[in-house]
Amino acid sequence: MKYIGAHVSAAGGLANAAIRAAEIDATAFALFTKNQRQWRAAPLTTQTIDEFKAACEKYHYTSAQILPHDSYLINLGHPVAEALEKSRDAFIDEMQRCEQLGLSLLNFHPGSHLMQISEEDCLARIAESINIALDKTQGVTAVIENTAGQGSNLGFKFEHLAAIIDGVEDKSRVGVCIDTCHAFAAGYDLRTPAECEKTFADFARIVGFKYLRGMHLNDAKSTFGSRVDRHHSLGEGNIGHDAFRWIMQDDRFDGIPLILETINPDIWAEEIAWLKAQQTEKAVA
């Protein structure tokens, strides 16, 4: 079964994320559990936790259908010790918030070397950061997102994801989220079913589908291999509809949150309905 949704706003209270997801007939959703552009957040209150859990229960969302995202400020591979410590503390807090909310996944961007350390050193720091966070939490899986490779961001090669996983001690609590826009911008073609087969055969060989814990379904304004992260609505960008239809018809993508981060929230309900329809329709757009 496919879990299909979008990254919805939690403005006004975390419970509102579940309500907004239900309003667009989503069977999955993503959210930030705190302001993603601030380091610190007030601790979760018992009321906030209870209201969130009640809303998820009311609208039939289990933790397997929810893919929270951490703050954009966090860099788990930071080359400077003090800044790395700050990121690690913030990441632990994000994991603990998920734990309190009964959530089992936390999606994050791996990190950046900032042109100050080698890729290898940065990847090792990211893995060590994950180990520290897993040691201080229970029940939450760290879900590494592939990146477009802008600037000094790592995670744009499947080999980067595999290297991080290799350095994580508890393999049962690490996974990956593949963003289609990021993959395309990083040089993994998805424009035809044949290219999708090739890209995900590479993924299966290098990382492994057992680690796939979520997807971000985004078309790309950016061009193929450009290393530029610019999302677009499904079928309106440089990837096109075929990739998303192909994903919907492949059971390797069952049972994980498939999350839209496309640019027009007003058509998320239509995009979700279209994706659901592709599971059975074999040809037409």
Swiss-Prot record:
Keyword Cell inner membrane (UniProt): no
Keyword field contains DNA repair: yes
Note accompanying the cofactor annotation: Binds 3 Zn(2+) ions.
Amino-acid positions noted as binding Zn(2+) 2 in the UniProt annotation, renumbered to this chain: 145, 179, 216, 261
UniProt binding sites for Zn(2+) 1: 69, 109, 145
GO-annotated biological processes: base-excision repair
EC number: 3.1.21.2
Catalytic activity: Endonucleolytic cleavage to 5'-phosphooligonucleotide end-products
The entry's keywords: DNA damage, DNA repair, Endonuclease, Hydrolase, Metal-binding, Nuclease, Zinc
Domain of life: Bacteria
InterPro entries (UniProt xref): AP_endonuc_2, AP_endonuc_F2_Zn_BS, Xyl_isomerase-like_sf, Xyl_isomerase-like_TIM-brl
Cofactor(s) named in the record: Zn(2+)
GO molecular function: deoxyribonuclease IV (phage-T4-induced) activity; DNA binding; DNA-(apurinic or apyrimidinic site) endonuclease activity; phosphoric diester hydrolase activity; zinc ion binding
Positions with a binding annotation for Zn(2+) 3: 182, 229, 231
Record's function text: Endonuclease IV plays a role in DNA repair. It cleaves phosphodiester bonds at apurinic or apyrimidinic (AP) sites, generating a 3'-hydroxyl group and a 5'-terminal sugar phosphate.
Family: Belongs to the AP endonuclease 2 family.
Annotated protein name in UniProt: Probable endonuclease 4
Source organism (scientific name): Escherichia coli O127:H6 (strain E2348/69 / EPEC)
Classification of source organism: Bacteria, Pseudomonadati, Pseudomonadota, Gammaproteobacteria, Enterobacterales
